[in-house]
Regions:
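Metallo-beta-lactamase
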Residues: 20-31, 64-66, 72-74, 128-258, ...
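Conserved beta-strand hairpin/beta-sheet module of binuclear metal-dependent hydrolase folds
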Residues: 33-83, 189-201
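Divalent metal-coordination and catalytic microenvironments
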Residues: 34, 59, 69, 84, ...
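Active-site HxH/HxHxD metal-binding segment of metal-dependent hydrolases
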Residues: 82-159, 167
Length: 314
């Protein structure tokens, strides 16, 4: 009888070893004296990356640790806790979630299991969407996209809301909240870490990664990027891709502004989305090698065209 279970046991052990090997390859990059970022893969969630594709970040304060976007799963959250433990034994007191998309925040639960009193902070729109079913939808989608790699991840909802203009103290540090309209997902906050001269942009900015806009507004995300650029911080942590300076927000604005303004132009000339694609692609040639360019360009043009047509009646 025991031999019947041997293939299952071997598969289970093999899967765990594969997960361990994958996550062991990622280390926290030190950005300044208090800030660390684990830069994730730039591909969309799949079995190989086990759903991990964002940039979990953490700040080591005087008495505790603040996490921003811990990632997509219990495995990603475990990796974040592992990297924190390499640097400090201080507890995690706060988690910021930048928006509703589950690749950024479904690791909340594994953090909360270790630190039950952790405050999980997000926009009220995100909290409402999560509790209305988006959290479960994202959990199910990630299981499907990764062929079961994220299975076992549970939902820990944000328990404190913040909106645009809010300044708060977390772990003795100062954070300003920036939110502009619908932007990337109609649930976004950008988090300005004042003492660290850092802006966590969420998915309002991707660097070397083209962002999907199926839940967003091109006009609002451009406004959000204008805000981000105006802050002139030393460090910008994007939702996906390497951390850098303000240039990554400027590049993201260039992509969105170029795409949307050309869609408006060609829409006024009577072109359909498929007819304008090659013209817009030529104008965005500098972004051609960014991850997701071919996959997202046509979709983004179609979404921008719908927004431009709607704007004609406003």
């Amino acid at each position: 009888m025991k031999h019947m279970f041997l293939p299952f046991i071997l598969f289970f052990c093999s899967s765990n070893l594969m997960a361990s090997d994958f996550f062991d390859a990622f280390k926290a990059d030190k950005i300044n004296s208090t800030l660390y970022v684990i830069h994730g893969p730039r591909e969309t969630p799949n079995p190989k990356n086990r759903g991990f594709m964002n940039n979990p970040a953490f700040i080591v304060a005087e008495k505790s640790v603040v996490i921003v976007d811990p990632g997509s799963s219990h495995e990603t959250g475990t990796m974040v806790l592992r990297e924190i433990a390499k640097i400090t034994s201080k507890p995690v007191s706060h988690i910021f979630n930048t928006h509703i998309h589950g690749d950024h925040w479904l690791a909340n639960d594994i953090i909360q299991q270790s630190y039950p009193n952790v405050k999980i902070i997000a926009d009220p729109r995100m909290i409402k969407k999560a509790r209305a079913g988006a959290a479960q939808s994202w959990t199910d989608n990630l299981i499907s996209m990764t062929e079961g790699a994220t299975k076992g991840t549970k939902i820990a909802y944000p328990n404190e809301s913040v909106s645009d203009g809010k300044q708060l103290k977390a772990a003795g540090l100062t954070f300003n909240i920036h939110s502009v309209g619908i932007a990337h997902s109609d649930s976004d906050i950008m988090i300005e870490y004042v003492e660290g001269s850092t802006l966590f942009t969420g998915d309002n900015v991707g660097y070397l990664r083209i962002l999907r806009m199926s839940d967003g507004s091109f006009r609002d995300v451009i406004k959000a990027l204008d805000r981000a650029i105006s802050l002139q911080k030393k460090h910008y942590v994007p939702g996906h891709g390497p951390t850098d300076n303000v240039k990554i927000a400027e590049l993201q604005r260039e992509y969105f502004h170029t795409l949307y303004s050309l869609v408006v132009k060609y829409n006024e000339e009577g072109l359909e989305d498929f007819e304008m694609k090659s013209k817009i692609e030529a104008a965005l040639v500098k972004f051609k090698n960014w991850a997701g360019f071919d996959e997202q360009l046509g979709k983004n043009i179609s979404i921008a065209k719908l927004e431009a047509e709607k704007a004609e009646f406003e």
